[in-house]
């Protein structure tokens, strides 16, 4: 079973539509069918039903909005998790991966970030990794990222965007 994270809703709905009729078998030998989406638009009641179906092995692909699925969801049954775009901070990435890496998890999960060479996403990834390394060296506890306030997370996002833009301006000036 697979989870796809994305900050934007349209790609999630398009992906779910593409795979709505697909069938397969999970590692328990249970047949799964189709896909589901969790975004901020999905009601709490429907969200719980989608999660229950995924955890029961009834759904093969779960498309999740990074913000909507970052907290309060446990999905340890997933075997693969793809990031169509990058979370804005190491804390956001830790929140997403933390939904899958739980006690009671039955299998390993592979996390795949879809990055194209020479894109803004690649540069953002470099900056995010640098910040995570600095944070880990200074604080030593990546779990502390989960305790970052909304204001601090917003400041981190703004800082990353500023650094990416400045990097592109420097690269353009040097060329």
Summary of predicted features, one role per range:
Residues 18-26, 99:
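Alpha-helical structural signal in soluble globular domains
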Residues 1, 34, 108-110:
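Residues at the starts of beta-strands that form the adenosine-phosphate
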Residues 88-175:
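A conserved SF2-helicase RecA2
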Residues 36, 82, 112-114:
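Hydrophobic/aromatic beta-strand patches that form the interior of the parallel beta-sheet core
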